[in-house]
Design a protein with these regions (language model features):
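Beta-strand/loop substructures that line and gate deep hydrophobic ligand-binding cavities in soluble
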Residues: 90-141
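Short, surface-exposed coil-to-beta transition loops
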Residues: 6-8, 71-76, 97-102
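Hydrophobic pocket/interface hotspot
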Residues: 20-24, 30, 78, 89, ...
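Hydrophobic ligand-binding cavity/cleft-lining segments
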Residues: 1-56
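Solvent-exposed residues in well-ordered beta-strands and their adjoining turns
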Residues: 12-16, 69-71, 81, 106-108, ...
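Glycine-rich portal/gate segments that line the openings of hydrophobic small-molecule binding cavities
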Residues: 42-90
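Short amphipathic alpha-helical signal-transduction/dimerization elements
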Residues: 28, 135, 139-151
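Short Gly/Pro-enriched turn/cap motifs at secondary-structure boundaries
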Residues: 1, 66, 93-94
Length: 152
């Protein structure tokens, strides 16, 4: 097993840093966004938004789980918060491999902020061959999708 590191592109979000942090640091705030009707509405408003193919999203304040095509059920928990700056996540209960993830926020100005996602995944060589490209693309798609959701 080896630890692989995946870093998203830096994305700019057209919302204040604190508003973005408040939305992302509580999984219950994300729950409404992942119902099929809301995803369809967001996709119509932002046709360039990537199709994340998440299903069965369930959440508490600190944990969530969802199904991802070609991966299966993924459980995620928030393990650390640094107000307005960082949200650290880790795999919980049901994950196909162990991982940790950081969502980093930085101000651009009072009305905009930057976001970057870093993923560390424990992958066997065989699993890495199968999912390496999907993880890199997926982390960029998630970062891009996070620029499209409403924060204020």
């Amino acid at each position: 097993m080896g630890t692989e590191k995946y870093i998203s592109e830096v994305k700019v979000i057209a919302s204040p840093q604190e508003a973005v942090y408040q939305r992302l640091s509580n999984f219950k705030n994300m729950e409404q966004l992942f119902n099929p009707d809301k995803l369809t509405e967001l996709k119509k408003q932002h046709p360039e938004m990537p199709d994340l193919q998440l299903e069965n999203f369930q959440a508490t304040e600190d944990e969530c789980s969802f199904s991802v095509s070609m991966v299966g059920t993924v459980g995620v928990q928030i393990i650390e918060r640094t107000p307005s700056k960082t949200i650290k996540l880790a795999g919980s209960k049901s994950v196909p491999f162990q991982f940790s993830c950081w969502i980093q926020l930085a101000p651009v100005d009072e009305e905009n902020c930057k976001l970057r996602i870093t993923l560390h995944a424990e992958l066997s060589p065989m699993i890495k061959m199968m999912v390496n490209k999907h993880l890199k693309n997926g982390i960029d798609q998630i970062a891009e999708a996070l620029t499209k959701i409403p924060y204020v």
